[in-house]
Amino acid sequence: MSLTPLGQRLAEVAASPEEPWEILAENVPVWPEPPRLQAVGSWDLDAQYAPSQGTEELLEALRLRQREQGIDVGAESLLVTNGAFDGLGLIARHLTGKGVRRAVCAGPVLLSVADLLRDLGLDVQVPDWPELVGGRSWSALGPGDLLYLNSPHNPTGACLDEATARDLFAAQRRLGFALVLDLVYDAFVHDPAALAAPPALVEDWRGVYGLNSFSKNYGAPGLRVGWITADPQEVDRLTARMEWERIAVSTRAQSQAAQLCKLGNQPLTERVRAGHRLVLDWARANGMRVSPPQGGTHVWVEAGVPDTEALADALMAEHRLVVTTSAHYHPASSRHIRVPTGVEPAFLTRSLEAVSAVSERLRRSATVG
């Protein structure tokens, strides 16, 4: 077991704190101004465990958030987790105990997701999003399968539309496979033709699990707070697993998350949309191939160089700039970099200029060679 390619680059950064590193690697949107939150309680919050399912304050805030999206569930259908990855692990361990043996993921998929599922002994298959979603390949799945699908998709930004989502949910009810919907970018759907809240179409939550978090949707990865939406009986079982695996999520973090949930995230969505326009214009001006994403907090750019790992190495060496490449995904390729669009505009512009300069030099070197 080893760190991901991005994790290795960030470890190199941590080992050289004297260097003026700049990080363009994380697709977490950054608040233009820190959100105005009330001071969170006293020492008492840290001197007691929260309920394993989550605090009443946060569960109610999440219920209201989902109601605004058209997702009609009660607090009994919600479980607070230590982020979306924690939720995925809870669900996957629960499902393997129920006999699930194969995981099918819409690809490319984060390397960490594939590794997590594979480490549980699952047979992990990763068809491309167009093959799986466009071809509606879920019709071949059954009770021994888990289908993991995120919309907006990381990294391509593709999203489910209403007709496809209805077909997916009908197939899940008919065929009995487990469906895990990763919704960690659901506040950032840009295409009017895309479905902003697929769970609003779920008629029966049995076998369906929604994942979400405050990391991307609220720009707060340090809180390590996420949530699962599921059938109430499954929430009871997952809450029991939460209790004996980690007891509960931090009470203080849940209080901050509840405030963020009530505050909303409009400054983040506006910044991400502006960043999308900037990156798309830059890519076209520099001859880089890119499909406008339907959603998400980044743009998946085909950099036009023979090897994006070499590009990333050069950016670190020459500009002290860290980027994420397609090696961070499975199956890996050598063509793409992931450009976050929710960062400070001047930093984004400066970083794109560095990427342009190094990419052009590498392209010229490849042509001469």
From Swiss-Prot:
Identify the keywords attached in UniProt to this record, alphabetized.
Aminotransferase, Pyridoxal phosphate, Transferase
Quick one: signal sequence residues? none
Q: Does the keyword Cell division apply?
A: no
**A GO molecular-function annotation:** pyridoxal phosphate binding
Superkingdom:
Bacteria
Q: Which residues carry this modification: N6-(pyridoxal phosphate)lysine?
A: K216
UniProt KW Transport keyword: no
Q: Which InterPro entries match?
A: 3metArgNH2trans, Aminotransferase_I/II_large, AspAT/PAT-like, NHTrfase_class1_PyrdxlP-BS, PyrdxlP-dep_Trfase, PyrdxlP-dep_Trfase_major
Check the record and name the Pfam families matching this protein.
Answer: Aminotran_1_2
Coiled-coil region(s) at which residues?
A: none
* EC numbers, comma separated: 2.6.1.125, 2.6.1.126
Q: Which cofactors, by name?
A: pyridoxal 5'-phosphate
- Catalytic activity line of the entry: L-arginine + 2-oxoglutarate = 5-guanidino-2-oxopentanoate + L-glutamate; (3R)-5-guanidino-3-methyl-2-oxopentanoate + L-aspartate = (3R)-3-methyl-L-arginine + oxaloacetate
Q: Give TM segment ranges.
A: none
One GO BP annotation is: biosynthetic process
The pathway that the record names for this protein is: Antibiotic biosynthesis
What is the stated purpose of this protein?
Answer: Aminotransferase involved in the formation of the rare amino acid 3-methylarginine (MeArg), which is incorporated into the peptidyl nucleoside antibiotic arginomycin. Catalyzes two rounds of transamination: the transfer of the amino group from L-arginine to 2-oxoglutarate to give glutamate and 5-guanidino-2-oxopentanoic acid, which will be methylated by ArgN. Then, ArgM specifically catalyzes transamination from the donor L-aspartate to the 5-guanidino-3-methyl-2-oxopentanoic acid produced by ArgN, generating the final product, 3-methylarginine.
Q: Which family does it belong to?
A: Belongs to the class-I pyridoxal-phosphate-dependent aminotransferase family.
Q: What is this protein called?
A: 3-methylarginine biosynthesis aminotransferase ArgM
Q: What is this protein's gene name?
A: argM
